[in-house]
Amino acid sequence: MNTLRKIYCRAFQKAFHIAIPFLPYRKPKITGSVKELPEIIMRHKCTHVLIITDGGIMKLGLTRRLEKALKEAGIPYTIYDKTIANPTTVNVREALELYHKEGCDAIIGFGGGSSMDCAKAVGACAVKPNQSLAQMKGILKVHKKLPLLMAVPTTAGTGSETTLAAVITDADTRYKYAINDFPLIPRYAVLDPKVTLSLPPFITATTGMDALTHAVEAYIGNSTTIDTRGDALKAVKLIFENIDIAYEHGDNIQARRNMLHASFYAGCAFTKSYVGYVHAVAHSLGGQYNVPHGLANAILLPLVLREYGSCIDKKLHRLAIAAGLADKKTPDHEAAELFIRSIEEMKERFGIVNIVKEIQETDIPKLAHYADKEANPLYPVPKLMDASELEKFYYMLMSLTSKENTSEAEK
């Protein structure tokens, strides 16, 4: 990245960092069970709820407890269950049409980040009928208060239940972009471990590593605060203490609860302090090839951390202490290596292989451009990179994919 652009990026990030205390950040109110939602809905005098979820959630029957509670309270509801991974503008349009057709005045995002992001986007479109989603992309373009928005995460990872962002993919161009504004923060986050008990081990692993990525990128960036550093450290501690238990013993309700809270803390951390190039590259892969976001983050996180080099050693040392991998006497570079290696070992334990077979070399300039456009100047990363420099990560993934395929063929 040239010097002038670096100066612009750092000035932009510094201005946002200075503004943090004056911006209307808020944390959602936490409730521990979907059974508490009818009382909340009635308290807000809402009359018809749109539940936005996906087909997999419906097949697993995860909404049944919520539906039963709503029926017993006499609250009408409508379900939109066509949300896909990396939700598209088509999903938002279909759900919005249902919202208006049924006369809804409250929204529940029930599922992973895709369902919650779709719910946020529907809420934004409901109050901004004369603007397209594309016109709302970027920062602070929604302005208006959304209908009552509640989030029920069924994975412990995305943190969307805490954040001001909705990430949507244009169905035509496959460009993935974020809408960022304070009204998109859900009013209530339901951290109900019972809805996560049936989560398969591999999804438990990749979404848990998504939460870890949120915490790490928020912590190592240049726009942290006392609060965000504290939230990130709590998230890392909880993840390292609980992710293996949740992976191996999915019915362990305490581990599931702790992972939900870790995801919540990580979401709070990156809402104020942002993420970094792991997310920017992962979003480009999700938009172009529909690569699951948590999987992309898990593969990319150690690659990007190593590329940052020694400039993040001190911060990784503190994260290593939180993870129980080092103490204050451990040299910074050793602690940093321990932390990165522990992430690589975590991937190996969970069977996460370095394969993104969809990548085409001819797509790399476009993908790197998308990542650059998302990250710069907004993300306060430790080391700035432009599109040409970001291309290396896609080539790394191609090389790793080739090695993994060769290894499999030799077995």
Describe each region flagged by the PLM:
Residues 291-354:
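Active-site pocket-lining segment
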Residues 2-7, 326-411:
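C-terminal charged capping/lid subdomain of soluble metabolic enzymes
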Residues 90-194:
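Glycine/threonine-rich beta-strand-loop-alpha-helix active-site module
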Residues 50, 58-130, 245-256:
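N-terminal small/polar loop signature for handling phosphorylated ligands or for N-terminal nucleophile
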Residues 68, 165-273:
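Carboxylate- and glycine-rich phosphate/diphosphate-binding segment that chelates Mg2+/Mn2+
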Residues 1-73, 77-79, 400, 404, ...:
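An N-terminal, well-structured beta->alpha segment
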Residues 157, 264-297, 375-378:
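Glycine-rich phosphate/pyrophosphate-binding beta-alpha loops
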